[in-house]
Amino acid sequence: MRDLKTYLSVAPVLSTLWFGALAGLLIEINRLFPDALTFPFFSF
């Protein structure tokens, strides 16, 4: 039961950090390439 409580307390923290980092990455991409439908480094 203690392991379950540890898991339930760690999962929200890790998901918050993950989604925060993902949001920051998306914000920086949109800052560098505003309104980009196709990114220059993805065009072949």
UniProtKB/Swiss-Prot annotation:
Pfam families attached here? PSI_PsaJ
Q: Which HAMAP family match?
A: PSI_PsaJ
* Keywords for this protein: Chloroplast, Membrane, Photosynthesis, Photosystem I, Plastid, Thylakoid, Transmembrane, Transmembrane helix
One GO cellular component from the entry?
photosystem I
Protein name (record)? Photosystem I reaction center subunit IX
Instruction: Provide the topology term for how it sits in the membrane.
Output: Single-pass membrane protein
Give the record's family classification: Belongs to the PsaJ family.
What organism is recorded for this protein? Eucalyptus globulus subsp. globulus
Which residues are in coiled coils?
none
Q: Name one GO biological process term.
A: photosynthesis
Mind telling me which Gene3D superfamilies this protein's record contains?
Answer: Single helix bin
Q: Does the keyword GTP-binding apply?
A: no
Summarizing the function annotation, the protein's role is:
May help in the organization of the PsaE and PsaF subunits.
Write down the superkingdom of origin.
Answer: Eukaryota
Q: Where in the cell is it found?
A: Plastid, Chloroplast thylakoid membrane
Sequence intervals crossing the membrane: 7-27
